[in-house]
Every structure is written in C-alpha cells, then in structure tokens.
C-alpha cells in the first residue's frame, strides 16, 4: 500500500482495542473516510473517541455483517479477530481487501524495514536486535506484536530511519504488500491452529514476510527448521542461515565460545541470557545485526547485560550467591521444561496455577537438578504429586507472595530460584504479568534490594 491509497477512501476499522484506535487515528491523518465497528459499546468519554468523532469518524456498536457493504474500499481489522467472523467473511465475499493496522502504518514509511516473525522467541529476538542496533549508535524504532501499534510511531519517521517490527501470523495475514529489507523467521512450529485451521495455512501466513522480497533484500532462516528448504527455494531474497553449529553463515558456537564470522567474540559463560532456546534467539539476532552493520563489540556489550524480556526466563538479580529468574510467561508444560533444562545448578522451583487438565508427569524427567519444589494454585496437588514421584522435597503455599520468603530461606549460594509455573495464571491473577510482578516485588521487599 502507498499513502495515496487511503486518501478519500472509505475504510472500516473493525475492533476498538489499542491497534484499532491507532489505525483509526492514522487513517484520519491519511485523509480516509473512517467508520469504526465494535462488538460492544464505546466509552464515549474517552479522549480518542472524542477526538475521532470531532474528525468525522462514524462509530457503530454492533458487529453483524449489515455494517459493511460494497461502498467500503478497505476493512482494517484487529489481528486477533478471526477471518471466520461475519463482517470479515462478507468483506472477502465482496472483494474488499482485509488489512491490519500494520499495513496502514507502513503505507507512509520508506525507511529501512526489519521484520521478525516465528512461533517462539520473537519478542526476545526483537529486543536483542533493538539493543544491538542502539549499542552500535543506530537509531531504531520498535513496534508491532511487541506491544506498540506501528501507527502510533510511524508518523515522524523518515527515509533515514530504521523500523523494527515483531509480527505475528495474525498480523502477517493482513499484510499483502510487506517487503522488509531484512526479514527473520526464528522458527516454525504448529501454532494457533484454532485460528489458521491447519499447519499449512499457518506456514503460509509466516511466508508472507518474504513473499514480496527482492534479490537485494535478506531473508534469515533457522538452518535446522523443517520448512527452511521450502522457504529458501521459493523466496527471491538472499537467504542467510543461522544455527547453533557451524552450518551458520554468520554466527555459531563451538560449545565454549560465541563465534561471529570466524572471530571468537566471548565465552558462552559470559552471556547473561540462559537456555539453549535463547542461544538460538541470540544467533538469529546477531545475524540480523551484522547485516544491519553492527560491530562485534556492540553485540558483546549487549549480551553481557541483556537478562531477557520481562516474565520470559528473565534474569532478575543475584543475592548472596543465589540467582533469581522470573519465567511467569511459562503457562504450559513445554515452556517450563525449557526453563528447567536451562540450569544445571541446584534449583528451587516455584510452580502452580490454573488447572487445564495438563499431564504434569511429563515434567518429572526435567527435575533432576531441582532441590526443592514450592507449589501453589489450582494445580498445587498435581505439582506435589510429581515432586514426590521424583523424590524431591515439596512445600505448599497459597500464592507466589507466600512462596518467595520460603524460597529465599531455603536457598544457598550457588542455587537458582526459578518461578516457572507450567500453568496459566487465571486461578489467582488477571494475567501472567501480574503474577510475575508479584514475584519481582516480593523478592525486592524480602531481600531489601
């Protein structure tokens, strides 16, 4: 899309979450004729509502398909709204292009575009790239699935700026014209099949990131990915591979050191971010950063201090020789398996949460380094059961808040204290962020830091 594509065009914005508000605001700035549709009532006292109403925006507080007709030129939907929703289905039948907020925002951007997608590791990898670019003295603006709608930040950017986007499969489906200068796919696993229908459609959504790339642009792929040969064969972009071994084109390890283009940059033990999955994220971020002109010294300076994204196996602090990690985002068994396997030190494991019927016995093989289990939440008794099967001591508490002083008093120098619940938070907390914040705040209070 180009900026002129929206001028004087009739555009429906479907969904009134943060991205919908940002899209409506940006479309008004682009001189579009905007209608906003939402399934529920609008807060008419909200500043953005008042501002858009004054600008001539029409608001409709129902989402049946009578709201849309052939007079509309575009439908811009919230990425999370399924394509099976009545309004979206009707738009497609009427051949009305269905876009996301990101497509609207990119219509007016002509600087360097770096885009990151993948099933896992997107946010951590995007954050690493951002910090590496900044450490090298480059100016970069980060947006997308990482939390900030692109429309909120794109206005002041010029052709000299770099825009770094984290993109979900939901967003990519509504980006028909995206053409990144550098595109990265961290990995692809079967994910969001309730939204996409099957794995083939999910993979096709991920391919959208490179569909329009040309020979002077770069596509970075995981050398170990099952879909990598197919993507490499189909894309017009230059393919650059990353891998933990030396099949990588840019960065790899020999088991002891991080090696970038043949230079031994730093020992792996000096990297603050832990876990084999995070090593892949690091190598992917380095590959992007080197293509973007970042020095090895800048990369090293970031890896020495980057402790992770909040709530994602996030290093918090070391006190009295004990290292503390917040992995509240670990809402399923697989995530907690990854977290537990990231440490070889004696580990005090804090776990529990909403009981969704998961088989927690799958975690027993991952408990070899655990010295104490502290259990809470609806799954408390399931956690107790697997601890006993693994012959590990276990203590029950009522909440994360109560677990923290127990963990501190039970720890010794050289230990790791790990919150990795293996369950969603909704039995006791509104979301995993609130649960993780409680862990962080209680640590600070109990440790006096």
UniProtKB/Swiss-Prot annotation:
InterPro entries found in the cross-reference section: Mur-like_cat_sf, Mur_ligase_C, Mur_ligase_C_dom_sf, Mur_ligase_cen, MurD
Any one GO BP annotation for this protein: regulation of cell shape
EC main group: ligase
UniProt-listed SUPFAM superfamilies: MurCD N-terminal domain, MurD-like peptide ligases, catalytic domain, MurD-like peptide ligases, peptide-binding domain
Organism, as annotated: Leuconostoc citreum (strain KM20)
A matching Pfam family: Mur_ligase_M
One cellular component term from this protein's GO annotations in UniProt: cytoplasm
Record protein name field: UDP-N-acetylmuramoylalanine--D-glutamate ligase
GO molecular function: ATP binding; UDP-N-acetylmuramoylalanine-D-glutamate ligase activity
Family of the protein in this entry: Belongs to the MurCDEF family.
Subcellular location: Cytoplasm
